[in-house]
């Protein structure tokens, strides 16, 4: 037998949906593991089934044929070594996971159990330990692996020798070509390089000198600018001095006009005195022209002419004296003013410099004030924009909060509804547990009847003859993924995938949230509303409303067809004691009425022998 591949990979979805036999994958992620080629039909392939949720089964009805070595999560049946028997994968149903029960586990077959053989189970079977065929197959696998490892090592050694030969050839080629390698003479470029370096140094020095000259010129320009500002400030100082002297000149002109007015008034007064004196003289002269001569002996009179002349001289002397005093006062005042102007020149220059500096300071402060005002306006605008933006964001956050509060209220309402539904389901679960207990008691009594009547070995592994029971023994496998609960009775493996409840009867496994099975071999389907089977061999109804029968075929999952997959294939549960159940995401296929496992049972075929049914309890 040749092995084509050894691969193991996990895929999120592979193959068709939770279907029946033949190695089709499921849609909830699968582990594909195959040693060799898979086969859907019967035959002699012992390392054959591909796996996945809905793992492969070999659905031939004939006798003989090898058991499946590869398995699935919830694996299927392969064909046994004798009629109706099937071999388990990795130690039978007691190692099952992701849906034990009848046919569950990593290929948990009808020969399951650590001590089960062909037909091992509740009623015992014929011989066989856990892995007689597995040991043989492991030897073959190890021999194949050893041969492949030896060929791989030979290939590696051959490649290393080829690599050494290539390295040797490369070294020989370099040794032959090494003498022909010559170096070019670049000495005639050295002078050119030196000339270029000298030119670079010269240009660098010139550039630095030009930079220094530019700096000096810039400093000289700054000095001339300062001198220009000083020269521009000097005419301003001279203009201020001229304005001050103009005021002094105006004051002097005012005093001169006052003196002229006084001079005019005194001149008019003098003229008036002369006129009055002349009139008096004329009057006196007229008196002297009369005929009367009066002689009076008096003292000699004063000469009026002389008196007037004296007075005239006195006034003229007074006027000249006043004029000289005024001129001297004017000259002294002008001298003092000129002296003051001469002394206040440096002080005026200092004051003008201070004034110019203060003007510059005022200009700088005005510029800074404008800058601060511009910055203030920009900051106010930015503040307004920020307020508007954050107000918008705050409004959005408030709207989101209101939406979240509405969603929270909705979630709370849904939670209340779910709590009510949970209470209802809990009451249903309690009622179903009571029914399961009743079924268990009935089944125990029926089993005692079978043992006493010698009806044959009732194995949930492979029975002989017409007893094609589903997998499972005293130690029926437990599947415990996705909240599955534990199995119940003698070998009743717990399916328990996706919230499955506990299995009930001799091998009845549950899957996908289904209710409990109720017959000797009837596994429970029953996810999402599936009804439980109630007879000796009646298969349970599948998921999503599969119907139940008393010996007929069970409805499949997802709208149940007659098989186990999505509306799946044909084989439902038979009507015999060992009739396997359809049900969960497609049961694995057995050779004759094997039960569909969890997550991967295929279709089953009806068994050949049937017995009476036990009435279903409500």
Curated annotation (Swiss-Prot):
Q: Which GO terms describe its molecular function?
A: structural constituent of cytoskeleton
| Region Linker 12: start-end pairs | 285-307
PROSITE patterns referenced in this protein's UniProt entry, alphabetically? IF_ROD_1, IF_ROD_2
What job does the chain carry out? May serve an important special function either in the mature palmar and plantar skin tissue or in the morphogenetic program of the formation of these tissues. Plays a role in keratin filament assembly. May be involved in spermatid nuclear shaping and sperm development.
Q: Tell me which species this is from.
A: Rattus norvegicus (Rat)
As for family, the record states: Belongs to the intermediate filament family.
Region spans: Tail:
447-609
Compositional bias (Gly residues) at which positions?
A: 17-26, 456-603
Q: Which residues carry this modification: Phosphoserine?
A: 14, 17
Annotated region described as Coil 2, given as residue ranges: 308-446
Q: What else is known?
A: There are two types of cytoskeletal and microfibrillar keratin, I (acidic) and II (neutral to basic) (40-55 and 56-70 kDa, respectively).
Q: Where is the sequence biased in composition, kind Low complexity?
A: 7-16, 27-49, 607-618
Q: What is this protein called?
A: Keratin, type I cytoskeletal 9
**Superkingdom as given in the UniProt entry:** Eukaryota
């Amino acid at each position: 037998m040749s092995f084509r591949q050894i691969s193991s990979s996990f895929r999120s979805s592979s193959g068709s949906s939770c279907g029946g036999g033949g190695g089709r994958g499921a849609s909830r992620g699968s582990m594909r593991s195959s040693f060799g080629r898979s086969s859907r039909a019967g035959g002699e392939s012992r390392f054959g089934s591909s796996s996945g949720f809905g793992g492969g089964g070999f659905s031939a009805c004939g006798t003989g044929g090898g058991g499946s070595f590869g398995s699935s999560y919830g694996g299927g049946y392969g064909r046994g070594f004798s009629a109706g028997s099937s071999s388990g994968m990795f130690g039978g149903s007691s190692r099952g996971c992701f849906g034990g029960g009848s046919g569950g586990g990593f290929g948990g077959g009808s020969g399951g159990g650590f001590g089960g053989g062909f037909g091992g189970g509740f009623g015992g079977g014929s011989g066989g330990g856990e892995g007689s065929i597995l040991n043989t197959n492991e030897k073959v696998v190890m021999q194949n692996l050893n041969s492949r490892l030896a060929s791989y090592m030979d290939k590696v050694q051959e490649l290393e020798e080829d690599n050494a030969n290539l390295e040797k050839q490369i070294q020989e080629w370099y040794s032959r070509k090494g003498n022909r390698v010559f170096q070019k003479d670049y000495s005639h470029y050295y002078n050119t390089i030196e000339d270029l370096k000298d030119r670079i140094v010269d240009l660098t020095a010139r550039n630095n000198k030009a930079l220094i000259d530019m700096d000096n010129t810039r400093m000289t320009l700054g000095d001339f600018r300062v001198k220009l500002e000083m020269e521009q400030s000097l005419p301003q100082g001279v203009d201020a001095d001229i304005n001050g002297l103009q005021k002094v000149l105006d004051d002097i002109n005012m005093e001169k006009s006052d003196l002229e007015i006084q001079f005019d008034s005194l001149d008019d007064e003098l003229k008036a005195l002369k006129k009055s004196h002349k009139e008096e003289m004329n009057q006196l002269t007229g008196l002297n022209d009369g005929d009367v001569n009066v002689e009076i002996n008096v003292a000699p009179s004063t000469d009026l002419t002389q008196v007037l002349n004296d007075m005239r001289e006195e006034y003229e002397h007074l006027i000249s004296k006043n004029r000289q005093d005024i001129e001297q006062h004017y000259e002294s005042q002008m001298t003092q003013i000129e002296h003051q102007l001469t002394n206040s020149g440096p002080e005026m220059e200092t004051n003008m410099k201070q004034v110019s500096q203060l003007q510059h300071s005022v200009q700088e402060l005005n510029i800074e004030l404008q800058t601060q005002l511009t910055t203030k306006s920009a900051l106010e605008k930015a503040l307004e924009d920020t307020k508007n933006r954050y107000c918008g964001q705050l409004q959005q956050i408030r709207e989101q909060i209101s939406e979240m509060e509405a969603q929270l209220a909705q979630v709370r309402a849904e939670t209340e509804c779910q709590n009510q539904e949970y209470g209802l389901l809990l009451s249903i679960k309690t009622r179903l547990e009571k029914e399961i207990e009743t079924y268990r008691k009935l089944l125990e009594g029926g089993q005692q009847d079978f043992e006493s009547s010698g009806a044959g070995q009732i194995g949930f592994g492979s029975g002989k003859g017409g007893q094609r029971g589903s997998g499972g023994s005293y130690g029926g496998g437990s599947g415990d993924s996705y909240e599955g609960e534990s199995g119940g009775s003698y070998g009743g493996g717990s399916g328990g995938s996706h919230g499955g409840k506990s299995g009930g009867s001799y091998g009845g496994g549950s899957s996908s949230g289904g209710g409990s099975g109720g017959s000797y071999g009837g596994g429970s389907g029953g996810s999402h509303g599936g009804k439980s089977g109630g007879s000796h061999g009646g298969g349970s109804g599948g998921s999503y409303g599969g119907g139940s029968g008393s010996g007929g075929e069970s409805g499949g999952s997802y709208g149940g067809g007659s098989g186990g997959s999505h509306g799946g294939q044909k084989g439902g549960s038979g009507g015999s004691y060992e009739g396997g159940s359809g049900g969960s995401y497609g049961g694995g296929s057995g050779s004759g009425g094997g039960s569909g496992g969890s997550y991967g049972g295929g279709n089953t075929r009806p068994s050949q022998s049937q017995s009476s049914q036990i009435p279903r309890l409500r």
